[in-house]
């Protein structure tokens, strides 16, 4: 393809900025990144409090986050943040030790069974489900894999046929039941559901295991974590500064027309002409009466074709809420806490995890995280969820004295099992490049 083509990238989050970096490395330098907000980073948002940055979005990484490491190397930065740790509480606020046999004598048989199932699960993923951790979803519904290996930072291209991969379209809970490893859900749930990715009875196993492949999950379990002193947003600020064409902030896109082999983007009232367009912003946001969250999808401002509308209208997303709160000194938690009891559908809207970022100072905010949507439940209204979380903090013994920041974010776009099984990703892959998009 001609290296002089003009490429428009919509979105200055991790995906959009990374697209610019990889294009630049391949010799494509006529790209423009349009970001509607006054900052880059998307869901990596790290505001300041008392001269230090805290996390309203992404918090941490692990050594198997190879794409993030690509950015670090490109920018000459590294993961230099505070060492995180955590404990656990039940929904009544009592500190528990769910994985320590000596603290749970009655649970020793279950913990031993979990350990056996974990070993079995690792073996199954490497053998029966070979290719499960290959980057991307193409081919999975057809029983094949094609992409880049997650086994090492080299990410060599791999492909192959494995009919068992079709099982990954099942909800993760059913996938575990099918393979006799139900108890591994107790391990995977912490870095999955509490991080906003939904519930195991609704989310296809493919999402769970491609995000949390065995190696990545074990890094979380062993607290082998990366953080950044200046926050995850700093990664993308650094990348933006190193790009030849930094993102143009406060870019409001009003219309996109694709015709006669060109792409016409109306941004801040001006029409700009491109040869290709890359979309890293939401493709579809379901319509809802009285919506005031400002969310729009690609199909709302593009000259969307019928095949695009048909596919993208199957996209769902999570309602994931974050509060940053202050506490009185005597109420400040000594460490971060996970609340497993609240990571199940019937506890929708309750506090799942709350983080203390810095060990050396209590003059900081605590951030809380909650989910408000399950496919078989009514969405919990934002204000109701907010009140529930603040009440939960009281129950935990760490009541908030004030809320200093809050965010409800369009999060984790995905499709459910029927659409996944029907080859949704392969249909989308077949459209790549169509309409110069």
Where are the predicted features?
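Conserved FAD-binding subdomain of flavin-dependent enzymes
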Residues: 43, 51-83
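Mid-domain catalytic core of redox enzymes
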Residues: 26, 252-366, 370-377
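Conserved Rossmann-like nucleotide-cofactor binding loop
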Residues: 15, 39, 284
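Mobile amphipathic helical/loop "lid" adjacent to a hydrophobic cofactor/ligand pocket
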Residues: 69, 73, 78-202
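N-terminal Rossmann-like FAD-binding beta1-loop-alpha1 element of flavoenzymes
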Residues: 5-32
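Conserved flavin/dinucleotide-binding core of flavoenzymes
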Residues: 351-437
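Glycine-rich FAD pyrophosphate-binding loop
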Residues: 24-48
């Amino acid at each position: 393809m001609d290296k002089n083509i003009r490429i428009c990238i919509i979105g200055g989050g991790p995906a959009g900025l990374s697209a610019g970096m990889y294009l630049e490395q391949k010799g494509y330098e006529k790209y423009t990144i349009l970001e509607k907000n006054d900052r880059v980073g998307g869901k990596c948002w790290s505001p300041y409090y008392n001269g230090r940055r805290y996390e309203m979005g992404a918090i941490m990484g692990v050594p198997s986050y190879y794409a993030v490491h690509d950015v670090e190397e490109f920018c000459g930065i590294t993961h230099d943040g505070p060492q995180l740790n955590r404990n656990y509480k039940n929904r009544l606020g009592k500190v528990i030790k769910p994985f320590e046999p000596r603290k749970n004598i009655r649970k020793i048989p279950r913990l031993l069974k979990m350990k056996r199932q974990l070993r079995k699960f690792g073996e199954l993923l490497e053998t029966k489900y070979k290719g499960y951790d290959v980057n991307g979803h193409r081919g999975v519904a057809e029983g094949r894999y094609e992409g880049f290996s997650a086994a090492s930072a080299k990410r060599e291209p791999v492909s192959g046929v494995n009919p068992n991969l079709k099982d990954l379209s099942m909800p993760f809970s059913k996938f575990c039941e099918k393979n006799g490893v139900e108890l591994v859900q107790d391990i995977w749930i912490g870095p999955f559901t509490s991080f906003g990715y939904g519930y195991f009875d609704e989310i296809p196993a493919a999402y769970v295991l491609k995000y949390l492949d065995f190696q990545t999950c074990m890094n979380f379990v062993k607290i082998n974590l990366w953080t950044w002193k200046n926050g995850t947003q700093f990664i993308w600020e650094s990348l933006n500064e190193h790009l030849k064409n930094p993102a143009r902030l406060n870019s409001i896109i009003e219309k996109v027309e694709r015709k006669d082999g060109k792409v016409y983007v109306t941004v801040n009232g001006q029409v700009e002409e491109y040869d290709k367009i890359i979309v890293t912003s939401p493709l579809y946001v379901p319509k809802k009466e009285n919506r005031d969250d400002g969310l729009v999808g690609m199909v709302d401002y593009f000259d969307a074709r019928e095949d695009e509308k048909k596919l993208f209208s199957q996209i769902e997303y999570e309602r994931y809420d974050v509060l940053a709160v202050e506490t009185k000194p005597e109420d400040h938690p000594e460490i971060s806490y996970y609340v497993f009891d609240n990571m199940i559908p019937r506890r929708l809207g309750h506090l799942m995890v709350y983080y203390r970022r810095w060990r050396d100072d209590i003059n900081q905010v605590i951030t809380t995280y909650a989910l408000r949507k399950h496919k078989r439940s009514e969405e919990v209204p934002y204000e109701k969820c907010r009140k529930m979380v603040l009440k939960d903090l009281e129950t935990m013994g760490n009541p908030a004295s004030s809320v200093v920041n809050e965010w409800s974010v369009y999060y984790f776009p995905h499709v459910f099992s029927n659409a996944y099984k029907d080859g949704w990703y392969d249909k989308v892959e077949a459209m790549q490049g169509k309409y110069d998009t």
